[in-house]
Curated annotation (Swiss-Prot):
InterPro entries xref list: Colicin_D_immunity_dom, Colicin_D_sf
Record's keyword terms, sorted: Bacteriocin immunity, Plasmid
A biological process from GO: bacteriocin immunity
Protein name: Colicin-D immunity protein
Function: This protein is able to protect a cell, which harbors the plasmid ColD-CA23 encoding colicin D, against colicin D.
UniProt cross-references to SUPFAM superfamilies, sorted A to Z: Colicin D immunity protein
One MF annotation (Gene Ontology) recorded for this entry: toxic substance binding
UniProt lineage: Bacteria, Pseudomonadati, Pseudomonadota, Gammaproteobacteria, Enterobacterales
Superkingdom per UniProt: Bacteria
Gene from which this protein is expressed: cdi
Amino acid sequence: MNKMAMIDLAKLFLASKITAIEFSERICVERRRLYGVKDLSPNILNCGEELFMAAERFEPDADRANYEIDDNGLKVEVRSILEKFKL
């Protein structure tokens, strides 16, 4: 298991190597894989959780609620999260 997989996905997304939809789908899978893992650093765990929450707010449809974000909004949030955790 790659404990950095969520961070790696975020970096792939920011580099435009995967789409926002791929990021939002794959981040959920990686999050599930980390359930019960006890030796994660708090920094990685918290960053992963924030990335997951940002992905949950992503809505590709133009008809989105005011709390939902589009591709560009997701990129801004993901970049901000990685900077916050210095990753």
